[in-house]
Regions:
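Active-site recognition of the HExxH zinc-binding catalytic motif
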Residues: 10-23, 35-39
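Alpha-solenoid helical repeat scaffolds
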Residues: 22, 47-48, 129
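An active-site-proximal "capping" alpha-helix that borders the catalytic cofactor pocket
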Residues: 32-47
Length: 147
C-alpha cells in the first residue's frame, strides 16, 4: 500500500465504524464510547496492515475484518482496483511503511484527549478482554464499554 494509503486507510476504518454504528441501529453514544470504538477499529486496521500478528491479534484482526466487511456491505461501499499498490497485493511492506504505521498506532495509543485517547484506551481494554464482537454487543445493549 502506498504510504498515504496507511493514513487514508486508518481514517476510513474510523469513519466506517461510525457508519456501522448508525446502520446497525446503535443508540446515540457518548463521545468517549463512539470515538473510542472508532479509534479501536482504526488501530486494529493499522495493526493488520503492519504486524504479522500473534494468535490473539490474528483473532482480533479477523473480527475487525468481519466488522469492516459488514460496514462495507451495509454502506454499499465499493473498492477500486487502482486503490492498492503492487506491494499491498503481495502483502509486502517497506521498512518505512511499517515505521509509519507504528507511528500512527502510537499517536492513537498516546492521544491525551479524553474523548479520543481515553475512549480508545477503554475500548481497546474491552476488546482485548471480550473481543470485538463481545464489546460491540455490550455497547449496543448498554451504550457503554464492558468493564
Amino acid at each position: 500500500m502506498l504510504c498515504q494509503g496507511l493514513l487514508t486507510g486508518y481514517i476510513l476504518a474510523h469513519e466506517m465504524m461510525h457508519a456501522y454504528l448508525r446502520l446497525k441501529g446503535y443508540r446515540i453514544l457518548s463521545p468517549e464510547v463512539e470515538e473510542g470504538i472508532c479509534q479501536v477499529l482504526a488501530h486494529l486496521w493499522l495493526e493488520s496492515e503492519i504486524v504479522s500478528g500473534s494468535s490473539s491479534s490474528i483473532a482480533t484482526t479477523s473480527e475487525a475484518a468481519a466488522v469492516a466487511a459488514e460496514v462495507a456491505v451495509a454502506a454499499e461501499a465499493t473498492a477500486t482496483p487502482s486503490s492498492t499498490s503492487s506491494s499491498a497485493k503481495k502483502g509486502e511492506k517497506t521498512d518505512f511503511e511499517k515505521k509509519l504505521g507504528e507511528f500512527f498506532k502510537h499517536q492513537i495509543e498516546t492521544d491525551p484527549s479524553a474523548i479520543y485517547g481515553d475512549g480508545f484506551r477503554a475500548g481497546i481494554r474491552a476488546v482485548e478482554r471480550y473481543g470485538l464482537r463481545g464489546t460491540l454487543d455490550h455497547i449496543k445493549r448498554s451504550g457503554s464499554f464492558p468493564s
